[in-house]
Regions:
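Multi-pass alpha-helical membrane architecture of UbiA-family
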Residues: 1-339
Length: 339
């Protein structure tokens, strides 16, 4: 069910929002572990459902364009069982949350968004901007607001500024993510004449749209989130992330992109949202509530890929720094003395 494509990329930032909401509300994140597990399982079910119906409805187009489809070789009974299993378990989660209307509504909204995006006769994927909004909402907006609502429900308090800033950020980030995805799929979509938003507009226009409208909105709302959450460590790790990417650019020529893919690129802020932001909040909360430190190991166990890659890169940077320092010392030692 393509879990490798969505597990860490979509669920880790959503958990980070839950951590941030708890930190803002001044409650131990560890006290929420049962709710966090239920939310994680619920969103994983929804993402698995989205993957299955997307591959199912794209099957013929993928075959025609030569794109990989994960349902190739799967029996009809397997596909039906996977869909029914996801739906039944999703309904069970909705029943479990039945006491909170907003929580259930946000959860069901993600399912509806994915259904409208993929399934005919709606198939918003081929209807331009409607497809962008449906996918961005299902993947990022509704899950992020679900995380805020779940923690707020547990605390018994609702922060309107926080809710609004998270909504703006998650929708903007979701739009940027689906635009990047559609641009990456552009060669395949052109072969089958698939009418996605990216196919209906010139790449130069999409570049400007992403760089000068979507990303500034995302960045502004995220700055508001950082201010509201009140974690200095989250800001410090943002600066560290910027240095990290600058070193990658310097050593390996890695390009940072907003929406339009390039050779050897990283998507701007993706690593921060997936790795550094949740870790910053867990570490910040641990200074108030030492038991929250246990969740750091749990989070890294669930989402190890980004952390392992960052650790490998950091080792290279440290080695490069040692080489530079050694060379600088060697030059000083060999420099002629002043008379």
């Amino acid at each position: 069910m393509r879990a490798v494509e969505w597990w860490e990329f979509k669920l880790s930032p959503t958990l980070a929002i839950a951590y941030a909401t708890a930190f803002l509300s001044r409650i131990p994140i560890s006290s929420l572990w049962p709710q966090l597990l239920v939310m994680l399982a619920a969103l994983a079910l929804c993402a698995a459902y989205a993957s299955v119906i997307n591959d199912l409805t794209d099957f013929n187009d993928d075959q025609a364009s030569g794109k990989v489809n994960h349902l190739v070789g799967k029996s009809r009974s397997f596909i039906i069982a996977a869909l029914i299993g996801c739906l039944l378990l999703g309904i069970a989660v909705a029943v479990y949350w039945r006491g909170e209307i907003l929580l259930v509504s946000l959860y069901l909204a993600s399912w509806i968004s994915f259904t409208l995006y993929s399934l005919p006769p709606f198939r918003l994927k081929t209807r331009g901007v409607s497809g962008l909004l449906a996918c961005a909402s299902g993947e990022h907006l509704f899950p992020s607001l679900l995380a805020v609502t779940m923690v707020s429900w547990r605390v018994g308090a609702f922060d309107t500024i926080w809710f609004t800033s998270v909504a703006t950020w998650s929708l903007s980030y979701g739009l940027r993510s689906i635009l990047w995805h559609q641009l990456s799929d552009l060669p395949n979509d052109e072969k089958t004449d698939l009418g996605t938003f990216a196919r209906r507009h010139k790449t130069t226009w999409l570049h400007r749209f992403g760089n000068f409208i979507i990303f500034p909105t995302e960045a502004a709302s995220f700055c508001l989130m950082l201010w509201r959450a009140g974690s200095p460590l989250a800001v410090a790790l943002l600066c560290f992330y910027a240095l990290f990417e600058a070193l990658r650019k310097r050593l390996w020529g890695v390009n940072l992109v907003v929406v339009v893919p390039k050779a050897g690129y990283h998507i701007l802020m993706q690593e921060y949202y997936q790795l550094f932001f949740p870790l910053a909040l867990l570490l910040s909360s641990s200074s108030r509530y030492p038991s929250d430190a246990l969740l750091i190991a749990a989070h890294l166990f669930l989402f190890p890929r980004r952390a392992l890659q960052a650790l490998k890169d950091l080792k290279v940077f440290v080695y490069a720094l040692k080489v530079i320092m050694t060379r600088m010392r060697g030059r000083r030692l060999s420099a002629p003395k002043k008379l």
